[in-house]
Design a protein with these regions (language model features):
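Conserved helicase NTPase catalytic core signature
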Residues: 1-70, 404
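Active-site-adjacent bridging/hinge elements
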Residues: 5-10, 29-33, 99, 104-105, ...
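Conserved motor-region signature of P-loop NTPase helicases/translocases
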Residues: 7-8, 74, 81, 85-303, ...
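P-loop NTPase Walker
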Residues: 37, 42, 46-52, 57, ...
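A conditional alpha-helix N-cap/helix-loop micro-motif detector
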Residues: 61, 212, 216, 501-502
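Anion-coordinating catalytic cores for phosphoryl-, nucleotidyl-, and glycosidic chemistry
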Residues: 281, 480, 496-513, 517
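Short, solvent-exposed helix-loop connector elements
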Residues: 379-385, 491-505
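Conserved catalytic motifs of ABC-family nucleotide-binding domains
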Residues: 463-499
Length: 613
């Protein structure tokens, strides 16, 4: 970074501003110390430990207690640590103490697949441990043969990923792992998988202008076409995205095309309307005197009270100065309701009263299943053409059973924890036959699919100008001076942080692409210049479209930003053909009607009490 530092110095530095920031750091550290002390006190009062405590406590025990350390050193004849590329320094220290220099350590890992930096993983730890083992007389073995992809796809992946990761190690960038070419084990693709084994389907325009939604429609059409041509099944496809916020464009497109799909984990599950309704209904069953949640339950498809009916309940509530639950269970608004709303209200009052008595006495899964049976909620969703919603309801019921929780409040806290914590990625993975799977790249780690689609390829990774904690430079505060410049030390730390994030983004692309067995497809949107030629792209596509890889940007093309055509471009990833189709905004994919429109139900094994009629 010497060149960058000289550039910054050349622009001049506001020394007074730098001094003020330096003086603010101790105050920031003091504030952090107070917050940390309160957090520690709260954990002590609750007798709870977080994951950081478990790691720190285990390491301290091994470091400070010789008897405990010797006990566990004798316990293990050998140590095998898998996925070592996703460990951190503290975990490495624990392994070192347990090994005690006896040469009994065996680690397995691939630094090119280290993608959990946001959880504290440090790919540098893997490199350091690998070098230490070899210095101590151990041996390193590289497993370069891919038993997943066939010869031509492996050749294409090598050509695609080599320029992305680079081939030379840089001692100044120990967090960047260079590319190592894969070797194929399998010669031919499976029958029915003809060339091209790499495809790009890109829609012209911006995301704000709906280009990603159009890209989703084009992809859905291509999936239908591939399945119609046989012998592929919808279950052979997986759409992998950098982040779950890209899911909706593909979910909606598949739904419009009548293609069955399953969204695996992600943030979207608990945001689905049918799941929000059921969680709200569980709250109403636990406490029907809560007017807000009860009103939401009554308006849900389970009870389907009309807006007019809800208005009359609320009006009676205000006039009588009582709660909606009292109005409902005593039928006080009966004279104001239509015949239909009167029946809905009576049915809702009977079901809520009956199930309210079960809350806290039986597991929440039993309460939820009793509600679903009493209201035929899943059947109603299927009848309304929402088979996906019915599958989501089945998944929620399975989650409720798996949790083993009795109290509704405790279960809702459990759900909120899953929704809001990082553990939502890859949780509750369900197996389904005959449905396209949509998941994040992190959730796909360790999996493989016949056809992998990398979705929203122009999406960039995270980033921003927040507070940084640099291991060498300390806390770095992003406060601009009067010339809108960040402090020089912050810019130095930010440059290093951005470089580490970029290196992990490259590894994330490597993981996504190498999940494919037969075919790799890239999907997303692309911008064009005023003359109709291709603009420089962002995200992974920006990396892959350059001259060193696919050279997409170098191909002559004349797109009409308001047209309805599709442009075919024959690209090469090395010697592997890559067919690229660019769709103008008005293009409409001709989706042939499918013979079967029903979507498969996810069958989850539940214990007898939940299956009883």
């Amino acid at each position: 970074y010497d060149g960058e530092v000289k550039t910054w110095l050349g622009k001049g530095i506001d020394l007074a501003h730098e001094r003020r920031l330096a003086e603010a750091v101790p105050a920031l550290q003091s504030l952090f110390a107070k917050a940390a002390a309160e957090y520690e006190q709260l954990k002590e009062e609750r007798q709870e430990l977080d994951y950081d405590d478990l790691e720190a406590g285990a390491l301290a025990l091994l470091q400070e207690n010789a008897a405990v350390r010797a006990r566990w050193q004798e316990e293990f004849q050998a140590l095998l640590v898998d996925e070592f590329q996703d460990t951190n320094g503290r975990q490495r220290d624990m392994v070192t103490l347990l090994n005690a220099g006896r040469g009994r350590l065996f680690i397995v890992g691939d630094a090119k697949q280290s993608i959990y930096r946001f959880r504290g993983a440090d790919v540098v730890v893997f490199r350091q441990e690998r070098e230490q083992i070899e210095q101590d007389g151990g041996a390193g073995f590289s497993l370069e043969t891919s038993y997943r992809a066939h010869r031509e796809l492996v050749a294409g992946l090598n050509a695609l990923l080599r320029p992305v990761l680079g081939e030379e190690a840089d001692p100044e960038r120990p967090w960047a792992e260079p590319f190592a070419p894969l070797r194929h084990h399998r010669e031919e693709p499976l029958p029915g998988f003809a060339e091209p084994h790499m495809e790009l389907h890109l829609s012209v325009g911006t995301k704000s202008g709906g280009a990603l939604e159009r890209a989703g429609d084009a992809l859905a059409g291509r999936i239908v076409e591939l399945v119609s041509g046989g012998p592929l099944d919808y279950g052979d496809f997986a759409i992998l995205c950098r982040a779950s916020t890209s899911f909706s464009a593909y979910e909606d497109a598949l739904e419009r095309a009548g293609v069955p799909y399953l969204t695996v984990a992600g943030r979207g599950f608990y945001g689905r309307s049918e799941i929000r309704d059921l969680l709200n209904i569980l709250q109403a069953l636990a406490d029907p005197t809560d007017d807000l949640v009860l009103a939401g339950a009554l308006r849900s498809p389970a009870f389907a009270l009309s807006d007019a009916g809800l208005y009359h309940l609320a009006r009676t509530r205000a006039e009588a100065e009582i709660g909606i639950w009292d109005v409902l269970r005593h039928g006080l608004a009966g004279g104001s309701l239509s015949d239909r709303d009167r029946r809905c209200a009576h049915r809702a009052a009977e079901i809520i009263a009956r199930l309210h008595n079960q809350v806290g006495r039986t597991p929440v899964a039993d309460v939820l299943k009793a509600f679903l049976d009493a209201t035929d909620y899943r059947a109603a969703l299927i009848q309304a053409g929402q088979a996906r919603g019915a599958r989501n309801v089945s998944k929620l019921l399975a989650d409720a059973h798996t949790s083993g929780i009795v109290g509704v409040g405790e279960f809702l806290e459990y759900v909120i924890g899953l929704r809001d914590s990082g553990t939502r990625e890859g949780e509750a993975r369900a197996t389904t036959e005959g449905a396209v799977q949509i998941m994040t790249v992190h959730a796909a780690k360790g999996l493989e699919f016949p056809v992998v689609i990398i979705g929203d390829v122009t999406r960039s990774g995270g980033g921003g100008g927040g507070l940084l904690i640099d291991p060498d430079l300390g806390p770095l505060v992003p406060v601009r001076d009067e010339q809108r410049q960040y402090p020089a030390i912050y810019r130095l730390g930010k440059a290093r942080e951005d470089d580490q994030e970029a290196a992990e983004s490259d590894r994330l692309l490597y993981v996504a692409a190498t999940r494919a067995r037969e075919k790799l497809i890239l999907s997303g949107c692309i911008s064009v210049k005023k003359d109709g030629s291709i603009s420089k792209s962002g995200g992974w596509l920006g990396t892959l479209a350059g001259e060193e890889v696919l050279d997409l940007e170098g191909h002559p093309l004349s797109c009409d930003p308001e047209g309805a055509g599709a442009h075919q471009i024959d690209l090469l990833a090395g010697s592997t053909p890559a067919a690229c189709t660019i769709y103008e905004p008005g293009y409409a994919w001709d989706q042939r009607p499918r013979e079967e429109e029903t979507e498969p139900e996810i069958v989850t094994t539940l214990p007898p009490p939940l299956l009883a009629p």
